[in-house]
UniProtKB/Swiss-Prot annotation:
It comes from Homo sapiens (Human). FU repeats lie at residues 193-240, 253-302. SMART domains: EGF (SM00181), EGF_CA (SM00179), FU (SM00261). Residues 332-353 are annotated as: Disordered. Ubiquitously expressed. Highly expressed in skeletal muscle, heart, liver, kidney and placenta. The gene is CRELD2. This is Protein disulfide isomerase CRELD2. It is found in: Endoplasmic reticulum.
């Protein structure tokens, strides 16, 4: 019995072999698409393997389930569950490759139990076996069993792409990723394995884990009595930071931090480390504090009715709401109105004298 076809099936995997368009460079490669279909098929096998009839008749169940295990009915259930109805790309791929999947299920599964190897590598030829790469599935650098000596990634590993070169993990370098980068040392190396371990942070090169095993000190460190120790850049003369900053030493480096806004020069963070106080601030209890000019014995705002408001490092003089501001005073509303309503002063007439 043949399974119903969703569409006319081609023998060549045209869809999977089409190269991705330049504008769609991030789309899955043919190998990724094939692997995804196989992963879904394998999951379908797991899901349908759990199926049982729960009737309690063991002999009947064994006979029935045995037939179901390799039946076309089970295959159809797996195929029907591979793609969501909205997944156009998955459904299109399945239509193109359903005949291959049917042939493997009904005839070749026992001989080729690894569906990925048979379907994606040998039949469609869009993938390679792990540890191999390129159109001819050549072995990666270091061999297919341990590409890049286990310390890197082989370009094109498992696909028909790439050049087989190694992209080494952090700490490793060389064509086979067996050499250690600066900042790492070889803690194990034999014919099959190479392990690079990070040096102490003070070492540029090293032969062991401590700051006494450095071959060369990192920038910001200096050799002192056989060990690489931190250079205190903040103790240098002249100081490395500007007059409005203070220096903060760190392992192998330093930072320049801004002084508090109340300071003119400083030795550290906050108003308690000012060298001098900025105008509007004065030393109080060991730190620069704002001077409240409005509370001074000598009056700060001298115009009549004027209010004084303190601000950080300064003050402002303001007339109350509704008062008219003049050069000499803040005039209350009633006085201002009276002044505006007065007639000009007239000289007395001769008759009045």
């Amino acid at each position: 019995m043949r399974l119903p076809r969703r569409a006319a099936l081609g023998l060549l995997p045209l869809l999977l072999l089409l190269p991705p368009a330049p504008e769609a460079a991030k789309k899955p490669t043919p190998c990724h698409r094939c692997r995804g279909l196989v992963d879904k098929f394998n999951q379908g096998m797991v899901d349908t393997a759990k199926k049982n009839f729960g009737g309690g008749n063991t002999a009947w169940e064994e006979k029935t389930l045995s037939k179901y295990e390799s039946s076309e009915i089970r295959l159809l259930e797996i195929l029907e569950g591979l793609c969501e109805s909205s997944d156009f790309e998955c459904n299109q791929m399945l239509e193109a490759q359903e005949e291959h999947l049917e042939a493997w299920w009904l005839q070749l599964k026992s001989e080729y139990p690894d569906l990925f190897e048979w379907f994606c590598v040998k039949t469609l030829k869009v993938c390679c076996s792990p540890g191999t790469y390129g159109p001819d599935c050549l072995a990666c650098q270091g061999g297919s069993q341990r590409p890049c000596s286990g310390n890197g990634h082989c370009s094109g590993d498992g696909s028909r792409q790439g050049d087989g070169s190694c992209r080494c993990h952090m700490g490793y370098q060389g064509p086979l990723c067996t050499d250690c980068m600066d900042g790492y040392f070889s803690s194990l190396r034999n014919e099959t394995h190479s392990i690079c371990t990070a040096c102490d942070e003070s070492c540029k090169t090293c032969s062991g884990l401590t700051n006494r095993d450095c071959g060369e000190c990192e920038v910001g460190w200096v050799l002192d009595e056989g060990a690489c120790v931190d250079v205190d850049e903040c103790a240098a003369e002249p100081p490395p930071c500007s007059a409005a900053q203070f220096c903060k030493n760190a392992n192998g480096s330093y930072t320049c931090e801004e002084c508090d806004s109340s300071c003119v020069g400083c030795t550290g963070e906050g108003p308690g480390n000012c060298k001098e106080c900025i105008s509007g601030y004065a030393r109080e209890h060991g730190q620069c504090a704002d001077v409240d000019e409005c509370s001074l014995a000598e009056k700060t705002c001298v115009r009549k009715n004027e209010n004084c408001y303190n601000t950080p490092g300064s003050y402002v003089c303001v007339c109350p709401d509704g008062f008219e501001e003049t050069e000499d005073a803040c005039v209350p509303p009633a006085e201002a109105e009276a002044t505006e309503g007065e007639s000009p002063t007239q000289l007395p007439s001769r008759e009045d004298l």
